[in-house]
Regions:
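Transmembrane alpha-helices and immediately adjacent membrane-cytoplasm interface residues
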Residues: 77-113
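Membrane-embedded alpha-helical segments of integral membrane proteins
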Residues: 36-81
């Protein structure tokens, strides 16, 4: 009589602590779903983090540097995290983060800039023309700060009597509001320096190679061979060699930069990351240009000009 309630009580306790056989698969499936969802979210976050790092060093080409690039990196990261390559994705992020730490905390970028930037001594006799290279555009019809720095440096050389005429290259970009051409803002800026500057612009270009070819078509038939090329500091080596490859005798002039980076980067992360990213890009682009025969193949002493 006294044992039955105890057995009943034990039976009730067991029924509360042990799930039924039918409930196990459902809870397991729910756990799996949660784990998979967490991995997908983690992968997406890793993908976006990689995009941020590459964006900071300006190594994202074309549309990847624009708004769709963020979503694409997130989706790729989520897909990779849901597959067997998720460890590889994490390793890539760790390596990228390590590079950022090294670049921002050491003078590596200053060393790279000192060894890479080409700055030729300007000839006492001057040059026939100075070519200011283009860069990016803004939707409000203005050229970006990099292109502005090139143009101002070029105008200064002409005003100082070191060049007879100014040549600018022409780029065009399409925005939601319509197409924007660099000549619109270039003409505004040239006019601010007075109307005495002899200024001509090339036809549209899409690359440094195009800039060299269009400038050659414009200047060489008129006998203009000795020129100065104004470019962003880390771009000088490839740009000036590309102009030499089409027949010019070039004096290379690194522009003074008002934005991050420059010939002598500051000790803050923005400058160091910008210079490092430019160096990585220029090394790859220089190799591609050399493989295609678009760079000057002059004697070694010309390639080893003082930096």
């Amino acid at each position: 009589m006294n044992r039955q309630p105890a057995e009943g009580l034990r039976h009730d306790k067991d029924s509360l602590s042990l799930p039924t056989a039918a409930g196990v698969p459902g809870k397991l499936r729910e756990l799996i779903r949660r784990v998979r969802l967490a991995r997908i979210i983690e992968g997406g976050a890793i993908g976006v983090a990689l995009w941020c790092i590459l964006f900071a060093v300006e190594l994202l080409p074309g549309i990847l540097s624009d708004t769709p690039g963020v979503l694409l990196f997130g989706l790729v990261g989520a897909a990779a995290q849901a597959s067997r390559v998720r460890r590889g994705l994490l390793v890539i992020l760790v390596l990228a983060a390590a590079v950022v730490v090294v670049v921002t905390q050491t003078p590596l970028s200053n060393i790279l800039a000192a060894r890479w930037v080409r700055a030729d001594q300007f000839p006492d006799s001057g040059v026939s023309a100075v070519v200011a290279l283009s860069a990016g555009l803004n939707p409000d019809t203005t050229i970006n700060s990099e292109a502005l720095d090139h143009l101002i440096n070029g105008l200064e050389l002409v005003r100082a009597g070191k060049a007879s005429e100014l040549v600018t290259t022409t780029v065009e970009e399409r925005f939601p509001a319509g197409a924007v051409k660099s000549t619109v803002d270039q003409s505004r800026i040239v006019s601010l320096f007075g109307g005495n500057t002899k200024w001509i612009s090339t036809s549209d270009v899409k690359s440094t190679r195009d800039e060299a070819l269009r400038s050659a078509e414009l200047l060489l038939p008129t006998g203009v061979r000795r020129i100065a090329v104004v470019a962003s500091p880390m771009h000088t080596r490839r740009a000036c060699s590309a102009f030499e490859a089409v027949g010019f005798e070039v004096t290379c002039v690194p522009a003074r930069m008002r934005s991050a980076g420059g010939q002598d980067p500051g000790p803050w992360p923005a400058d160091r990351l910008k210079v490092f990213g430019d160096w990585v890009y220029e090394v790859a682009a220089t190799a591609r240009y050399r493989a295609r025969g678009w760079l000057d193949s002059g004697p070694p002493e010309r390639a080893a000009r003082p930096l």
